[in-house]
């Protein structure tokens, strides 16, 4: 309540009451007129306090939130309080008469705070000594629920019903343990031996007493197991787990992951006793669950906020706090934190990389150590067994120093006939293999001599005889395999010796024509300046460009010359060996004047320029293919480039041609001769001898068997025709017999009628016209016999529903013949039958 000076009236309104508004507080000893005081309400007008004017708009005029105005008990309490307040107001401020006290019809129960507490009770509840928190007070961040949990972090807390059941169970267990009487109390005891006494003492069960902590642990395990395995138990009580499903949680060690604290309580003790306790507690837990209709025994808080009108929702969100706008200070602090985070991450990444580098160094040192130890063991083995020998590769593995490669040496070609590329490569390969074999034999011989010398000096051999024999056998086997391999590869070229395979020239290269073709005399010409032989003469090509323009392409000449003596360095050998393809002065597009200063040519030495140009154009296919030893030119890929000016080659050109030289210029008819010989040999060849084992000839068909087979087939066909004819004949006979029987019956009836007419005529001849009038015409009889008509014609017999068969022409002919025979037979039989009937009639008349 506020002072009278701050009272809110209808004519004067005060400012909005907030947490910063200063209010006068009245104590119990102050005299305050409660009837004159008024309740201060929240100011909801828009012009209240600026930016906070809309902060408490959800507070109603009664001081209650708008969401709680729908609760009926709160509305009843507010209306009752307003009625009580209006009834207690005096009629006028000056009246002293007190109104009768009215009781609240409905109120919200709250603790009574109107009375005074006695000094004795106050001194017991509130001590005068002030509590001082110790310095070593233990602080932790666990919540109240976590702190009040039982064993294993299970949050089950026993209530009054559990306490009553536990007290009854413990009292019964303690009472039952004292009810067992001894043999002396029951009467004269039996004499029992010492072992039996110990057995009886062991058989007596110990009293089962369950502590409160143990009871809460067992109930908590039941609740957690049911919550995980039967969450919908409140919908169907049949899902309640039996004790057999939960018994393993007590008879065997429980998993720490099952408990909320992830720790097994140390106070459990014996598992057998724990299982017995759980077996006794299970019926009580089951009954409690059934009473709760499958719900948890301990009531759970309702956190479901889907229904806003539910008053039992816990921790309901009253209002949504508006997010504050970001300020500059906040941005600055965020940037500082981000910068600090980036620096820490960079430092961590750098440290991680340093650690990785050191680990790699450690692994590298360990690998080098292992390699050094392996080399040392290998060296010790070689030193201990000298007979094994030492190759260049093994020496390189031990010392780690590469073997010095000797300078390249080309063997001199002797003889009168120049070698081709195939002969040269095979000769080089054989020479290399021979040198390798000689070197290996020499090393083995030296190793054997050293071993013998060391054995003679020491008096005994270092290597056992068995090991020597084994090594010799292995070496011999290896040599045999190498020799066999060499024989198999005698007619093959190893690509390892010349691994470079030049690309085939393009079609445009073949279109060039050299000057040798145009002017054969120019083929013997040499360079006028140097006198070198021309390897690749000038060539031209005519092609047609765009717009029909005819263009002439040319290629300069390539000369072969070797400058100086044969070099010994491998780096200088290609320059001396390969042909020079640098252009000459005569190959320029236009001649230079004598007075022109060649400053740009003096900047770089001609030797370096020539070397660079040769290396650049050596493998150019368009230029003329790969040129060099073993690589060939575009005209002849099997040609070896050599120095034509050498004395051993030039002597073949300066001398006159011999008969053998002319024979070499003629075309080789070797292939034609071989073909002719093969044809002659095939014509004169003898027939091949008969093989020992021949495939038996196919059996010839027997004409008699074929004739018998054909005759059998004809007989089968005739038999089938006869069977078909007999079947048709049988059908015709059946039809003829049926017709004959019908005709016989008709004739018998006709004779009977004739006899009856004769008798009538004999009895009375006065009525000759009666019979004629009754049958003036020949009427067909019921039996189907045709009666004669006055004109002498006969009527066709009715079909009587018989279906007519559609037969082929040959069958119709055969059937007609059969019908004729049947009719003849039937007529003969009918004639005989008529004669018999006439004889019978004559005998009857007589």
Curated annotation (Swiss-Prot):
Which residues lie in Pro residues bias regions? 686-702
Q: Where is the composition biased (Basic and acidic residues)?
A: 180-203, 432-452
Q: Where in the cell is it found?
A: Nucleus
Polar residues bias locations:
411-426, 783-796
Give the keywords, sorted.
Cell cycle, Coiled coil, DNA damage, DNA repair, Nucleus, Transcription, Transcription regulation
Gene Ontology CC: one annotated term: nucleus
* Keyword Coiled coil carried by entry: yes
Locate the coiled-coil region(s) and give their ranges.
434-490
Q: Does the keyword DNA repair apply?
A: yes
What is the role of the protein in this entry? Component of the NuA4 histone acetyltransferase complex which is involved in transcriptional activation of selected genes principally by acetylation of nucleosomal histone H4 and H2A. The NuA4 complex is also involved in DNA repair. Involved in gene silencing by neighboring heterochromatin, blockage of the silencing spreading along the chromosome, and required for cell cycle progression through G2/M.
Q: Which PANTHER family match?
A: ENHANCER OF POLYCOMB
User: Subunit details for this protein?
Assistant: Component of the NuA4 histone acetyltransferase complex.
Family assignment? Belongs to the enhancer of polycomb family.
* Name recorded for this polypeptide: Enhancer of polycomb-like protein 1
Q: Which organism is it from?
A: Cryptococcus neoformans var. neoformans serotype D (strain JEC21 / ATCC MYA-565) (Filobasidiella neoformans)
Q: What is the lineage of its organism?
A: Eukaryota, Fungi, Dikarya, Basidiomycota, Agaricomycotina
- UniProt lists the gene as EPL1
